[in-house]
Structures are given as C-alpha cells and as structure tokens.
C-alpha cells in the first residue's frame, strides 16, 4: 500500500551509497595530454593515483612543465571549470627552446629581430646597430639555435678622441678591514680591479677617470663617523660614498642627504635600509634580506600553493622580512592562513601550527632557535611527505647535527625532522658561464681576484661579497656615464659637482635607479628602495646534505630549475588537505532487488485487476463493490511504480533531469495513496455509517448508492491533485545538496573525501510537509478507528469490509513506523530507501493479497461462477449466496442435533425398561398392599408413565 506520509522523506535521500561511485566525482574535467617534450604536474596526487582516475574535480589546477632547456609558451596553468572544460583550451601550450632575451637589447644601439614566431625561439635572428658616435665591438648578427646564440653579444663603444685629457672623479669608501665583518679584505681588491677595468674602457666615461679614497671603518659606527667627517671636509670632493657594514651604512646613508651625496653599499643586508624616507639616496649591490621573499613566492606559485603559514623569532630583521612577505603573497593571490611568533620557546607556536593543519611553513629564526623549533617539530610530527619547511640558507651545512644542550632531541631525530626542507640564499657569483659587461665570466673574475689576495680565499674576509663590490663600481660608472652624456650626448659636467649641487645628485640618482647590466654577480638592477635584485640559490636537504635544485632571477622572473628536487611522497604536497567532493549513490544491488519486487507487485496488481473485471458479473464479486477494488489495485500499481523514481539519483540521471524525477515521485505517491487507500477508506466509512446507527434509522440507510462511494473517492483524489498542483506551481521541488563531514580515506594519501547527498526539496518544504502529514495522518487514524468499530458488522452489500479493515491496519502500522524511522535515516540513503520502498512494497502486497486472493480462492474451490440471473433460474429463489450458506450450515447442524436426540431417546428407553424391572421385583418381595390413599375407593387401571414426564431424579440419572 502507498505511504504518502513518507513522500517528503523519499524526496530527500536520493543520492546514495558510498559503494557505488562510478567516478571520483560526478562533476569535473577529463585528464588531458601534456605538450610534446613536456609533462603535467598534478598537485597533491601521485603518479599511481593519476593513472587510476579519469576525471579531476572542479577548480583543480594542473601545471605544464618542460624537459631540458625548454620553456612553456602559452598557458602554463590550466584550471578545471564547472562546465567540465579546462581554461584557455583555445590557446595551445608548447615546450620550445628559448635563447637569452638579453640579446634583444643593446645599450647605445638598436636590435632588429627577424625570423621565429616569437622572440628568442629557435631560428630567430638579431642584427645589431650602434647609435651615432659609437661603433660596434663584436659580431653584428647572431642566430638562436637550440637555446644558444651563435655569437657572443656585442657592445657599442664610443668613438674617443685620441689624446683627450681625462678629469678625475673621486669615490670615498669605507672598507671594514677588521671587526665583526672584515669584508674589506677581499672587497677592496675587487673595487680596485673594477676601477682598472672601467678606466681602461673607451666607451665608459671617456673624459673621466675614477679614483678611490678609502679608510678602514672596522665595521664600527663610531670609527666610521670619524672617517666620514674626514671624507666630507677634506679635499677633493667625493661624488659618492661606499660603506660596507649595515651598521656603518645606516649612519652614512642617514647623513649623506645633508651633503647631496649618493651612497652605494656593497655589503649591507639590513631590511631597515630599504626605507626610502629615512635613506633617500641609498643604493646597495648586496641584496636585502627580504630578497628571499620573491623566490619563496615564485616557488609557491610553481608548486601551486595558495595557503601558507609562518613562524618567526621576534626580532626586527625577521619581523620586517615577514611583513614584506605578507605583502608579496597578497599580491600573488596567496594567503598566509596562520602566523606564529616566539621569543625563546617555540613549543606552543609549533603545536598551534599542527592544530591548524599548516602544510607549507616559512620559518624565520637564527640557527640556535632553528634547532629548538625542529626539536618541537619532531615531537609534534610536523614533518614528512605532507609538510614543507622554508628556512634561511645561511645556516651552517650541519646546523641540525650540532650539539645543543638546550634541546632534548637526538641527532637522528633532528635529521629526520629536517629532511626535505627548502632553503633560499642570495647568489653572489653568477652561476652561468656567461660574460659580464666587463667581458669576464664569473670564474675568470674569481681567478683574477684570487691572484690579488695575499691569503687563501677561505681565510679572507668578504670573499663571497667581493663580486658585489666589483659590480658596485660598474653600477657607479654606468650611472655617471649616463649623467655625463656618455661622451657624445648632452649631459652635465661631473667636475661641476659640489655638496650643494642637488641637480647633479638628482641626475646621478635617476641614472643609478635605472641601472641594468650583467655583472659577475649576476644581473644588476635596483628596486624602488635601492636594494639589489639578485639571483637566489634554492637548495633542498636530501639525505642529510644540501643539494642545489635551482636559481631564481627576480628581475627577469626567471626560474632556472635543475629538476633534482626530491619529495618523500613522490611529488610536492598540497598546501592543504585536498578535498574531493563525491556523491553518495544508492546501492545498485538494493535498487535492483527492490525494483524486481516492485515489478512483481505491479504484475500481481494487474492480475487482480483483470480477475476483478472478468468476474464482475458474479454475485459474490458484485457484493464487494468491484469498482472500488479496481481503484485500489490501480492505486497499488501507482505506488509500486513510484519505487523506480525513488531510486534514481545522480548515478543514473543528470542535474537537469532531477526536478522531473522529483515531481514524478510526488505525483505517483500522491495519486496512488488517494486511489488505493481512499477506496478502502470509503468502504469502511459507509459500513460504519449504515450499521452503527440507531435501530430506527437503519432501514432507510441500508440502501447503498454506488455513486456516493465513487464521489467520496473522487473528492479525496481531487484534494490531492489540487494540493500537488499548487505545490508544483508555487514552490516546485528542485535538487539540493546535503554535505557531510570530511572523511579520510584508508590509503595514506593527503586527500579528504567530502561526501554529498542529493535531495528533492523546496523553499517551504516544512509547510508542505505539515499539510501532508496532518491530512494523511488523520485519514490513517480515522481508518483504524472505523475498521475497529465495524469488525463485527455483517452486511451483504460490502461482503469484504473485514478484509478492508485488515488492509487498513497494515497500511497504518507500516506508515506510523516507517515515517519517523525514515526521517531519522534521511542522511543514510540505503537505509532510508530500503525502509521507504519496502514499506510501499509490503503494504501493496498485503492489500492485494487480503482483498483479492480470498475471492479467487472462493470462486475456484466452490465453483461459484454463476451470475445473479443464472442463480435465480436454478433455485427459483432470490436468496443470495450469503443466505444459502447459512441455510446449509443450519441444515447440517439440525441433522447433527437429530442424531444426538435419537441417541438420547434410545438411552432413555433403556433406562425406563430397567426401572420397570426393578419395580416388579420389589413388588414380589412386599405382597401386602399399602393403605389406599383414596380411602378404599377402587383405582382405575394403571397408566404407563409418560415418556416425557420425568422427575428431577430421573433427569439426573438420564444425563449422568
């Protein structure tokens, strides 16, 4: 029987069972092929996992990577859209060889590009031409082939007038030859080398000669103050100042603006020196400590990380560095989800990182604090294939193996905790074997400088920073060359500079700010704060030792990758647990099983309906109101048919088809309930109305008018149609998604499953549920009451009302039990579907069996196939089948009673005979005649006793 009370419940749990999942998700994009000579990096997935799936979820990003010296031309990253396609599919991505783009520009000249569909591709050709008053030194043409230019890059040299007189320009320098950082030991010889190379060039400052005046600052601000005074107040005038240490540079740069002097440092790294308001004329070829941040951001983008966390030691240098990182990641669309700091004890911050599920962590602290941090990292298990740590690269190579009494972790534990972390370190020597503006490679520079040093390079202070000092002189020379006009163009006279001439200072500042050239330390360029933009070395700890995995040039946004990075999990981890949305679908075995039962039930309903129609002329069938029974069979068929759309979900149908399925469930169940239960309710209502009234009102009510029964059923069906139509028009059912808590898969992968379940719902679902629950619930309760009240009533007009009552009991019980259970289990698709569908199946089966099977059995076993006319002709009587049955029962009972009476009479006769015999014997023993009670009057002849006149003793003897 139908269970419309369960309609809203069936309209909800129609995504279903976890066991049936045809794809990772019902929505997503199909995996695509990489370009030739390239591959695809899948974030958070291993190679085996990629092979096992065909679709990737919406918003998932893939990145193209190329082999060898090739680079991606076209979109590097594609994102899965909601419509199932990847972004920018109309633009192909290719892996091509690209030559250096530095050949596309020529100072004091022009470059003409021909061939190749894009600059610097294989087959591209460049021709070089110099401006007037300059001549070309080198080849005038170069061709790009297999990522290399065919000839070295030429340069334009000024046409110098022979025997021209050159004027001296002085530089005031402070070299720390001793103290905390004795960098002047190697930087001073490097500066002297640069001055020799610059002064020997005919195309740079052809009318001037750079000369150096220097002092030993000892990396002491007090000592530096003394020498600064001497430089400023003693002739000759210095056009620029060159301090070394950060502490000395802070003093010099803050005071230099009062004398309109440009300050160029070669060894200062403090982020505080990037403050343009405080140090308006400061430049440095030594990168700021914040230069690590562009590299970090680039790596975040390379590996597709959008969420990072940070932990820092509370010192000024790390705070300012982290503030800069926060601004940069925000511009790149990356979020710092969690920021922690500590002064001396990192235990609590590390625990907080673990609690917040931090995966990509940037650590800023000194070496001693680094050991404390990673001891806590080991305790919290905040390492392994799910985590990546970014640290500063200037720690000692074995910093994690150094004995430290402040921690309680062993060397083995520390080694395990730090494995795989990434470090960034400033590159102070160009790793590429290319020639700089001085026509020297970095290796040639090292060899030439080593010959000038008095001690071994490892024992010489500032040897690593020496390339920066060398390039500082070249940056100054090129800026002064631009300011003076380069010998052939209009410019200022450098010899006119004095400490009150701000005009020349401003021009030198602008020229210095626009510097861009290839030095022995790499590409030299300054950012808006005057800090050097240099290459960054990227290393990874692999097997307990650091391995170079790449370089990054932030000025060109060029990442040189060696592809030697290794990951514990085989690939870079995700920045968070990868959440894959999956729909819970109904178990197909359950759906098929219930569908088979429902199909058999529909067949049974058709058989019952056919039987009822075929035998509608039989009196016994006629007296059961066959038309109402036919409606019941049709209602059961509709209810059983509703099982099929109840089991349809996203596994079988698309999103656009879901509203139609929702409406099908609603209408099939609604009409099925009205027809099936309404027909039975109408029968039991009429029986109760007619046969439970007072005796004086019965006679005129016993006339059954069928049209009233049909009108009652029509009223119930009409109410349902009206209500369902209003519901569908005003607030139609649509597809909604229920989201459950994340689930961790059994496999040890960094993925969480987000289960979702499809439901049919509407905006005012609770209102409609209240209407249906109230209306149908009252019908069920009233049906139970009427069935109970009429259980002892017997009527020939509706001879199956007791069977109808039994069917109503079953339907009501199943509804009242299944409705609340299904509401509780609405989020468990298999259980909810099983309860709801089986309730429909069982109630329909019971109704059909109770109403129709007894009729079939009676007609088959008793052969009562005659119609009413045939029965009248045969018997000559209008006695109905019910009266004939009663007559036969009474006759049988009468025969049994007659048999019993005959047996009793025979027994009575036998007892009488025995009684007479005893009386005769007694009379012989007592011959005297007793006194005559009649007073001597003669007695008439004795009469035999009446067989029916017995006293109490005889009756007792008779039945003893």
Swiss-Prot record:
Q: How does it sit in the membrane?
A: Multi-pass membrane protein
Swiss-Prot/TrEMBL domain comment: Alpha-helical parts of the C-terminal intracellular region mediate heterodimeric interaction with GABBR2. The linker region between the transmembrane domain 3 (TM3) and the transmembrane domain 4 (TM4) probably plays a role in the specificity for G-protein coupling.
Entry's localization field: Cell membrane; Postsynaptic cell membrane; Cell projection, Dendrite
Question: Can you name the source organism?
Answer: Mus musculus (Mouse)
UniProt feature coiled coil, ranges: 868-924
Segments for region (Interaction with ATF4)? 887-915
Lineage of source species: Eukaryota, Metazoa, Chordata, Craniata, Vertebrata
- Recorded protein name is Gamma-aminobutyric acid type B receptor subunit 1
* Span of the signal peptide: 1-19
The gene designation is Gabbr1
Q: Tell me where on the tree of life, at the top rank, the source sits.
A: Eukaryota
């Amino acid at each position: 029987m139908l269970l419309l009370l369960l309609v809203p419940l069936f309209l909800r749990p129609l995504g279903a069972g976890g066991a049936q999942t045809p794809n990772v998700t019902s929505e997503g994009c199909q995996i695509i092929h990489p370009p030739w000579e390239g591959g695809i990096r899948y974030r958070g997935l291993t190679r085996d996992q990629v092979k096992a799936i065909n679709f990737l979820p919406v918003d998932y990003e893939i990145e193209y990577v190329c082999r060898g010296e090739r680079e991606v031309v076209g979109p590097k990253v594609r994102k899965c859209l909601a419509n199932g396609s990847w972004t920018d599919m109309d633009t192909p991505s290719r892996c091509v060889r690209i030559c250096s783009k530095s050949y596309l520009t020529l100072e004091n000249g022009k470059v003409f590009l021909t061939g190749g569909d894009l600059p610097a591709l294989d087959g591209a050709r460049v021709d070089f031409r110099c401006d007037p008053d300059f001549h070309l030194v080198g080849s005038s043409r170069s061709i790009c082939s297999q990522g290399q230019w065919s000839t070295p890059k030429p340069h334009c040299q000024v046409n110098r007038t022979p025997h021209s007189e050159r004027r001296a320009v002085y530089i005031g320098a402070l070299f720390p030859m001793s103290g905390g950082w004795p960098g002047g030991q190697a930087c001073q010889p490097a500066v002297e080398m640069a001055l020799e190379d610059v002064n020997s060039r005919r195309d740079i400052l052809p009318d001037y000669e750079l000369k150096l005046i220097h002092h030993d600052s000892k990396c002491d601000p007090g000592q530096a103050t003394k020498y600064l005074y001497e430089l400023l107040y003693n002739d000759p005038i210095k056009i620029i100042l060159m301090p070394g240490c950060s502490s000395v540079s802070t003093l010099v740069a803050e005071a230099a603006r009062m004398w309109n002097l440009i300050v160029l440092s070669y060894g200062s790294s403090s982020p505080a020196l990037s403050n343009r308001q405080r140090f308006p004329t400061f430049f440095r070829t030594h990168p700021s400590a914040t230069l690590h941040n562009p590299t970090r951001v680039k790596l975040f983008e390379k590996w597709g990380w959008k969420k990072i966390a940070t932990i820092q030691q509370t010192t000024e240098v790390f705070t300012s560095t982290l503030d800069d990182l926060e601004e940069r990641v925000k511009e790149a669309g990356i979020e710092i989800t969690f920021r922690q700091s500590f002064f001396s004890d990192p235990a609590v911050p590390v625990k907080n990182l673990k609690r917040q599920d931090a995966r990509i962590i940037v650590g800023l602290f000194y070496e001693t604090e680094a050991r404390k941090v990673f001891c806590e990292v080991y305790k919290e298990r905040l390492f392994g294939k799910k985590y990546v740590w970014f640290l500063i690269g200037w720690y000692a190579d074995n910093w994690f193996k150094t004995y430290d009494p402040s921690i309680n972790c062993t060397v083995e534990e520390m080694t395990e905790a730090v494995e795989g972390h990434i470090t960034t370190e400033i590159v102070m020597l160009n790793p590429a074997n290319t020639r700089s503006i001085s026509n020297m490679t970095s290796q040639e520079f090292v060899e030439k400088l080593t010959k000038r040093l008095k001690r071994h390079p490892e024992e010489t202070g500032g040897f690593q920073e020496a390339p920066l000092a060398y390039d500082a002189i070249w940056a100054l020379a090129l800026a002064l060359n631009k300011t003076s006009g380069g010998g052939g163009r209009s410019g200022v006279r450098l010899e006119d500079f004095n400490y009150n001439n701000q005009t020349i200072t401003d021009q030198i500042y602008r020229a210095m700010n626009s510097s861009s050239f290839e030095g022995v330390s790499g590409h030299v360029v300054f950012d808006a704060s005057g800090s050097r933009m240099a290459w960054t070395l990227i290393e990874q700890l692999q097997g307990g030792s650091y391995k170079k995995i790449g370089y990054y040039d932030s000025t060109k946004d060029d990442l040189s990758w060696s592809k030697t990075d290794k990951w514990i999990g085989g690939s870079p981890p995700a920045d968070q647990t990868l959440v894959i949305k999956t729909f819970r679908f109904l178990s197909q075995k359950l759906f098929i099983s219930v569908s088979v039962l429902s199909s058999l039930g529909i067949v049974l309903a058709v058989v019952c309906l056919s039987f009822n129609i075929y035998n509608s002329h039989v009196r016994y069938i006629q007296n059961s109101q066959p038309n109402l029974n036919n409606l019941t069979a049709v209602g059961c068929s509709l209810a059983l048919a509703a099982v099929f759309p109840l089991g349809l979900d996203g596994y079988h149908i698309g999103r656009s088809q879901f509203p139609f399925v929702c409406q099908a469930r609603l209408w099939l169940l609604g009409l099925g309930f009205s027809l099936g239960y309404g027909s039975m309710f109408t029968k039991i209502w009429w029986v109760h109305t007619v046969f439970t009234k007072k005796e004086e009102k019965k006679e005129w009510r016993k006339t059954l008018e069928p049209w009233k029964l049909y009108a009652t059923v029509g009223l119930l069906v009409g109410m349902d149609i009206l209500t369902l139509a209003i519901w569908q028009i005003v607030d139609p059912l649509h597809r909604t998604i229920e989201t459950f808590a994340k689930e961790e898969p059994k496999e040890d992968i960094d993925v969480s499953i987000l289960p979702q379940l499809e439901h049919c719902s509407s905006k005012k679902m609770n209102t409609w549920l209240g209407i249906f629950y109230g209306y149908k619930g009252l019908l069920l309760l009233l049906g139970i009451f009427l069935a109970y009240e009429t259980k002892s009533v017997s009527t020939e007009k509706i001879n199956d009302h007791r069977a109808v009552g039994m069917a109503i009991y079953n339907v009501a019980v199943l509804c009242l039990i299944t409705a609340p259970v299904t509401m509780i289990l609405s989020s468990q698709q298999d259980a909810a579907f099983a309860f709801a569908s089986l309730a429909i199946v069982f109630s329909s089966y019971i109704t059909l069996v109770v109403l129709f099977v007894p009729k079939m059995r009676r007609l088959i076993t008793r052969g009562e196939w005659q119609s009413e006319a045939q029965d009248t002709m045969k018997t000559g009587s209008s006695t109905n089948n019910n009266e004939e049955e009663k007559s036969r029962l009474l006759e049988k009972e009468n025969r049994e009673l007659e048999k019993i009476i005959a047996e009793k009479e025979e027994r009575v006769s036998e007892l009488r005979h025995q009684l007479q015999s005893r009386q005769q014997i007694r009379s012989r023993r007592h011959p005297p005649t007793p006194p005559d009670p009649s007073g001597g009057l003669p007695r008439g002849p004795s009469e035999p006793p009446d067989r029916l006149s017995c006293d109490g003793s005889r009756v007792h003897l008779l039945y003893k």
